C-alpha cells in the first residue's frame, strides 16, 4: 500500500472512533449542568439543615426559659407559704389523746 492511502485510512479510523467516543461521553455543557444541579442540591440541603438546627435551638431555649420561670415561680410561691405550712403542721391535734 502506498503511505498516503495508509495515512488516510488511519485518519478515517481515528475520526470514526472519536465520533463514537463523543456520542458516549456527555458534553461539557451536560457535565456543567450536572455539577450545578449537584451543587444546588447540596447548598439547599445545607441551608435546610442549618435552619432546622436554628429552629431546634430556639425551641430548646424557649423550653429552658419556660422551665426556669416556672421554677422561679414555684420557689417564690413555696417561700411565701412555707411559714404557713410550718405553723399548720405544729398545731395538729392528736386524735387519741383529745378524745379522753
Swiss-Prot record:
Keywords: Chylomicron, Glycoprotein, Lipid degradation, Lipid metabolism, Lipid transport, Secreted, Sialic acid, Signal, Transport, VLDL. Glycans are attached at residue 94. GO terms for cellular component: chylomicron; intermediate-density lipoprotein particle; spherical high-density lipoprotein particle; very-low-density lipoprotein particle. Transmembrane segments: none annotated. It is found in: Secreted. The most abundant glycoforms are characterized by an O-linked disaccharide galactose linked to N-acetylgalactosamine (Gal-GalNAc), further modified with up to 3 sialic acid residues. Less abundant glycoforms are characterized by more complex and fucosylated glycan moieties. O-glycosylated on Thr-94 with a core 1 or possibly core 8 glycan. Residues 68-100 are annotated as: Lipid-binding. Its main location: secreted. The keyword Cell membrane does not apply. Residues 1-20 form the signal peptide. Coiled coil: none annotated. InterPro entries: Apo-CIII, Apo_CIII_sf. The record marks 41 as: May interact with the LDL receptor. Component of triglyceride-rich very low density lipoproteins (VLDL) and high density lipoproteins (HDL) in plasma. Plays a multifaceted role in triglyceride homeostasis. Intracellularly, promotes hepatic very low density lipoprotein 1 (VLDL1) assembly and secretion; extracellularly, attenuates hydrolysis and clearance of triglyceride-rich lipoproteins (TRLs). Impairs the lipolysis of TRLs by inhibiting lipoprotein lipase and the hepatic uptake of TRLs by remnant receptors. Belongs to the apolipoprotein C3 family. This is Apolipoprotein C-III. The gene is APOC3.
